[in-house]
From Swiss-Prot:
Disulfide bonds join 34-70, 43-66, 48-62, 53-90, 72-84. It comes from Ixodes scapularis. It is found in: Secreted. One of its GO terms (molecular function) is peptidase inhibitor activity. Keywords: Disulfide bond, Protease inhibitor, Secreted, Serine protease inhibitor, Signal. Salivary gland. Midgut. This is Ixochymostatin. Belongs to the serine protease inhibitor-like (TIL domain-containing) family. It comes from the Eukaryota. Residues 34-90 form the TIL domain. The keyword Chaperone does not apply.
Amino acid sequence: MKTYVLQALLLTLAVAVVRAANTGIEWPPKPQKCAEGETWKECVGSSCAELTCEHPEPSLGCTYDCNYGCYCAPDFFRNANKECVKKDKCP
């Protein structure tokens, strides 16, 4: 019985690896050129990756997901127009 369960798990893992390899998506993604006030971040939690004009203080807890992309650089805040601006430019 243990042998069958182990074989099933290995087969499932093999199928998942093959599917991931055939998606054409590079992982992890290569760093991209970011807009002014942004910086490329790797494997950051989405809830703590950047501050916003609406929420200028860091949250108490961060998620453990792993995201890649352009996020507001230190001392910049994401505004309603999705731009990273200095604090004095926040409404």
